[in-house]
Regions:
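Eukaryotic N-terminal low-complexity, Ser/Thr- and Lys/Arg-rich leader segments
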Residues: 1-13, 125-135
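Gly/Ser/Thr-rich loops at beta-strand to alpha-helix junctions
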Residues: 18-23, 70-74, 100-101
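A short, well-structured beta->alpha microelement
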Residues: 37-59, 122
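Ser/Thr/Gly-rich flexible loops in soluble cytosolic domains mediating phosphotransfer, phosphorylation
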Residues: 82-132
Length: 135
């Protein structure tokens, strides 16, 4: 279950980090195609840790999407970034993709399309939960 304490709308800043351009940029394209307006990708293999931290620091009240492949494939980088977020970016909400974020008919390992769709599923679920709390 996602716990979001800030307002989450289709205008909330969403950042996704990844190492494969198709997955990382594909999430951005799919989210934008579904009405999310402030979406960006961080390609960890082409962006320095300092640049990533600067982007996080300058993005309060944002959603940071982290795929399972990032946690498994880049454990030192992710440990460093998650520690940085905890200490320096208290209003950045981190969501690590889990199996429940995928459609039920997803094949394993998931295809690029299925990985990208998981990001949309996450954002739509948070949006729905945020809407259910509004009076």
């Amino acid at each position: 279950m996602v716990c979001w304490v800030m307002e989450f709308t289709r205008q909330t800043k969403i950042m996704t980090i990844g190492h494969l351009p198709g997955h990382t940029n594909g999430k951005v394209a799919l989210l934008k195609a579904n009405g999310f307006t402030d979406v960006s990708a961080i390609l960890c293999t082409a962006t320095s840790v300092e640049e990533i931290k600067a982007k996080l620091k300058s993005s309060p009240d944002s959603l940071f999407l982290v795929g399972g492949a990032m946690m498994n494939g880049f454990p030192d980088l992710m440990a460093d970034l998650l520690d940085f977020i905890a200490k320096e970016c208290p209003t950045v909400f981190v969501h690590q993709t889990v199996k429940a974020d995928f459609d039920t008919d997803t094949t394993w390992p998931p295809t690029e399309e299925q990985v990208n769709k998981s990001a949309l599923n996450i954002c739509l679920r948070i949006l729905k939960q945020a809407g259910s709390r509004q009076v």
